[in-house]
Amino acid sequence: MNTPKRNILFLLIFLLLFAGSSIYLFKDKINRLFFEPNVPSAGGSVSFEEGASVKDNKPIEIIAENLKIPWEIAFLPDKDVLVTERPGTILRVGTDRKIYHIEGVESSGERGLMGLVLHPNFEQNKLIYLYFTTDTNGTLRNKIERYRLEKDNLYDKTVIIDNIPGSIYHDGGRIEFGPDGMLYITTGDAGQPHLAQNKNSLAGKILRIEDDGSIPEDNPYKNAVWTYGHRNSQGLVWDNQGRLWATEHGRSGAQSGLDELNLIEKGKNYGWPTIQGDETRTEMETPVINSGPNYTWAPADIEFINGSLFFSGLRGEALYEAKINDLVTPERISSAPEIKIHFLKEFGRLRATRLSPDGYLYITTSNTDGRGEPKSGDDKLIRIDPEIFANR
């Protein structure tokens, strides 16, 4: 073969090899971007440290399997566990397994039966509260209904609050009673970001109401709104100093990230959609910590244990820990806490995170919600001894 032909052949071989490797690299990049859970990367607003694993030989027990998109956990005085399932059922796990069906739940997309909380005086009044989505002639709304759980059945349905804007996405859904006896509610922006800045709308807010649905006299805006400027907050917890913390889902899609951990204060504006992440604007709050633009938690729920905030990650597929007691002053926070990552990719997508009265941490997986990769037995209710997190 003469030299020109040999050179052309070598050039063609080189181009084919280069094209093949480029296609592989491009495919690998697409797979990582859209289909793999994010892993810690340089930059962003937090530092990361490896945490607990199922390999640590501490007690981790599967309490229930084959759940249907479990969303919330509550503990009854008899030690039975209630778990909401997004399609519209409540599973009672204990000596007897019972299912309660809730009428009128619209459950496609992210909507459905979500929050559940017992009244602070449940042992006397037997009242429970449920947050769920309804569809009335094509109009989606979220509402809270109250029931009396007695003699193993639900009675006396009462609507506590309704007309919370709903959507296929961004429906919020967490409900908690605070130390002040008030009911706090997270709502999403219902896919309409501008509603988060409208104090007359119940979308994109943290709400605060009396246990009967009436408006407390000390609310900042004479309606149910406690704070505003939220995209889709789905976790609420009070620490041992009485401060309220909330998790917040950041932006979606290929450019996901900027998930938030916020310290919630009466009447404040948390910025969505005007600011996000480390951006600032007068009279708008920036998060205590955010995941940065290159990392996604998709934080679903939050719990406080021994000086740390533990929050579950959906797309992040992990349980995250932020130690705050050494960093928080009586008024604010002095620096961003380090994040420990527990159970990375070991259970898949995690949603509910609840500390039981006897000191165990209960979590649920969310691998059957259409965005995960279900394994045998999914979805699961899992019980963890918090000792697994010690000295990690």
Report each predicted region and the residues it spans:
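N-terminal Sec-pathway targeting helices
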Residues: M1-L16
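Beta-propeller domain segments
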Residues: K29-S53, R111-L113, N121-E123, A190-G348, ...
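Beta-strand-rich domains and repeat architectures in extracellular enzymes and scaffolds
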Residues: E61-G88, W297-E303
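Surface loop/turn motifs at the tips and blade-to-blade linkers of beta-strand repeat domains
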Residues: I62-K68, Y100-S108, I161-S167, A224-G229, ...
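Conserved beta-strand position repeated across blades of beta-propeller domains
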Residues: A74, V117, E176, V237, ...
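Residue position within the beta-strands of beta-propeller blades
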Residues: L82-E85, L130-Y131, Y184-T186, A246-T247, ...
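Blade-loop segments of beta-propeller domains
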Residues: D96-P120
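Asp-box/WD-like beta-propeller blade repeats and closely related beta-sheet repeat scaffolds
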Residues: R141-F177
